[in-house]
Regions:
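Short, exposed beta-strand/loop patches in secreted or surface proteins that constitute
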Residues: 3-8
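Short, hydrophobic/aromatic-rich segments at coil-to-beta transitions
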Residues: 9-15, 130, 139-141
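Short acidic/glycine-enriched loop/turn segments that link adjacent beta-strands
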Residues: 10, 21, 149-151
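Divalent metal-coordination and catalytic microenvironments
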Residues: 12, 27, 37, 49, ...
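Pre-active-site segment of Zn-dependent metallo-hydrolases
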Residues: 15-60
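Metallo-beta-lactamase
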Residues: 33, 40-41, 132, 139-182
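Active-site HxH/HxHxD metal-binding segment of metal-dependent hydrolases
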Residues: 41-133, 171
Length: 182
């Protein structure tokens, strides 16, 4: 059975660790919460989030890759930049998801019932630069950061000056794949 680990980063922000080294973040305002990324889609991330907050949750996807967006099927309100629809569909294929998981050290703990069905990106709300998400007492601003994918987005938590980058900027950001902008 897949379990997630969570660590409080600040009063508003909790970092959630997935089994494939992916990181997700729960940002809580006074009225609602935003989950940034949903990981690989093995095990119920939604159950973990419900233990962390009783507020309504929206999901903001930094991009459509297998390790960032495949758990979105558990959630009602999901935002993604639709420039990533094609890569989301490709990475949502069962074979790609299981291959990605096999790279994880915890692969032996996963059973088929842990598999979360891939969502239809057509049901996601569009996400674009300039979108603002007021969570009550704190706001997430959306910025385009195309490169890693054609729809990569980052989110700034104004009040704490925390920038959530997904894979837009790190030591392993791939910029040479078919879906990257190079």
């Amino acid at each position: 059975m897949v379990t997630y680990k969570a660590v409080k980063v600040s009063d508003r922000v909790t970092r959630i660790f997935g089994i494939c080294t992916e990181l997700m973040y729960l940002v809580e305002g006074e009225d609602k919460a935003a989950l940034i990324d949903t990981g690989s889609g093995f095990g119920s991330l939604k159950q973990t989030v419900e233990k962390l907050t009783d507020k309504p949750v929206i999901v903001l996807l930094t991009h459509g890759h297998v390790d960032h967006a495949m758990g979105a099927g558990e959630f009602e309100t999901v935002y993604m930049n639709h420039n990533d629809d094609d890569i989301f569909k490709k990475h949502g294929q069962s074979s790609i998801r299981w291959d990605s998981l096999r790279m994880s050290e915890e692969y032996v703990e996963v059973v088929s019932s842990d598999y979360i069905e891939t969502a239809d990106a057509g049901r996601f709300y569009p996400l674009k630069e300039g979108d603002r998400f007021d969570l009550g007492g704190c706001t997430l601003n959306t910025y385009a950061c195309y490169g890693h994918t054609r729809g990569s987005m980052v989110f700034l938590l104004e009040e704490e000056r925390i920038l959530f980058l997904g894979d837009a900027c790190n030591s392993r950001t791939f910029m040479f794949q078919d879906y990257s902008l190079t």
